[in-house]
Structures are given as structure tokens and as C-alpha cells.
Amino acid sequence: MNAEKTSVAPNVDHAEIAKFEAVASRWWDLEGEFKPLHRINPLRLGYIAERSGGLFGKKVLDVGCGGGILAESMAREGATVTGLDMGAEPLQVAKLHALESGIQVDYVQETVEEHAAKHPQQYDVVTCMEMLEHVPDPQSVVHACARLVKPGGQVFFSTINRNGKAWLMAVVGAEYVMKMVPKGTHDVKKFIKPAELLSWVDQTTLKEQHIIGLHYNPLTNTFKLAPGVDVNYMLHTTAKQD
């Protein structure tokens, strides 16, 4: 087993947390700042469920769960879900929405590194969606996710590629032209090239299984999963068997 990196200081960017705390009350507003997350959630959920062989009866961890959009939808599929986030306001919104929806999700305010120290190899599926580009040390998050999943389990990451097209689409287009997300949501310097993410994965017990792009068509106002990872992309990995 390869040595895996562990952070000493909490792997938290408080400015990033503050961005999401400021708009947390509108997390479940289908026409608000998080409309794109609601729009792409069925695609994410379908990809995760299909690549995992279904979610029913599985123990799932959603890292960087925010207000709980993906976490709740996985719980609706019959999974036992834990949602992890360091933002107090988004977690409070998530807890209240789950209560109103009658959906059972265990929400915890804790870093993924802290959670991995307490719960190694506890989860069948670990998801980490659009979170890596919001922390100081994304490599540490990848290593922690690898420690959390059971041997043979599934780990999913999604993030944004770092190149000129991604800057135009995810920052200029999404934040300033289309106004799909609040200005300042993304910092292109924190975007992650697929080769970088795969190199971190290779340092762990995880093995790449599949990578796919998430594409937006402004003419039809639709999202789809398809080949091409030059902007948004999702990575499916599995943990090696003991």
C-alpha cells in the first residue's frame, strides 16, 4: 500500500466557505444561485448510480455536500448517506430540507481528513463533487477519500480543467455573461488538470475506471455527459481489493 498524505492543519479556505455561507439560504431555490447544481444533479446521480451498480443499501459519503442536493438524491435511491461539509450555514440548510422532505441524511461538520482518521474503509461509495477546486490542498482530499472507501468500493470526483477554454466557459461565461453562478465563485488558478488529479489518484489505493466531460450548450440551455474533458469533468475510480 502506498504512503498517503495527511494534512496537519485543517484543509479549509475560510474565504471559500464564506462565499457559500452568504448564499446558503437559497440553496434549494431552483431558480437561484444554485440552479446549475439542480440542473446537473440528475446527470451526476445517474452516472454515480450506474457506475456503482446501484446505490440501494450502500453506505455513501458525500464530501463537500453543501446544502445537500446530491446527498438527498442518493438517499432517495436507498443509500445510507453521510454528508460532510465545513460550512455551518449550508449544513443547517441541508438538515432542515432533509427534515422537511422526510429524507434521512447524517450531516457532519468536519474535514474529510478528520473523518478519514475516524472512519477508515467505512464507505461503499464516496463522492466529491466540485469541491477540490475550493480547498488549499486538493491532493490531501483525494488521499482522504481513498482512506475512507472500502476495498473494492467506488470514489467519484468532479472538478474543472485548468486552461483557457475552462476560464472562458466557467468564469467569464458562467459568472459574467450568463450569470449562472455568482461572480467570484471560481478561481481559475485553483482549477485542476485531469493529469494532476490522476497523478494524485495514482498515489493511493484508487485506480481510474472512467472519465467523462460535463458539457453545457447555451443555445439549447441543456447539460449532457459526453467525451471531452476540457472544462468540467467527472472521474470514477475504484479502491483496490485487499
From Swiss-Prot:
UniProt-listed GO biological process terms: methylation
Top-level enzyme category: transferase
CDD domains, alphabetized: AdoMet_MTases (cd02440)
Superkingdom of origin: Bacteria
InterPro entries to which the protein is assigned, alphabetical: SAM-dependent_MTases_sf, UbiG_MeTrfase
Pathway where this protein functions: Cofactor biosynthesis; ubiquinone biosynthesis
UniProt KW keywords: Methyltransferase, S-adenosyl-L-methionine, Transferase, Ubiquinone biosynthesis
Reactions catalysed, as given in the entry: a 3-demethylubiquinol + S-adenosyl-L-methionine = a ubiquinol + S-adenosyl-L-homocysteine + H(+); a 3-(all-trans-polyprenyl)benzene-1,2-diol + S-adenosyl-L-methionine = a 2-methoxy-6-(all-trans-polyprenyl)phenol + S-adenosyl-L-homocysteine + H(+)
Residue positions binding S-adenosyl-L-methionine: 44, 64, 85, 129
Record EC number: 2.1.1.222, 2.1.1.64
Pfam families the UniProt entry points to: Methyltransf_23 (PF13489)
Entry GO MF terms: 2-polyprenyl-6-hydroxyphenol methylase activity; 3-demethylubiquinol 3-O-methyltransferase activity; polyprenyldihydroxybenzoate methyltransferase activity
Family: Belongs to the methyltransferase superfamily. UbiG/COQ3 family.
PANTHER family for the chain: METHYLTRANSFERASE, UBIQUINONE BIOSYNTHESIS O-METHYLTRANSFERASE, MITOCHONDRIAL
Protein's recorded name: Ubiquinone biosynthesis O-methyltransferase
Gene: ubiG
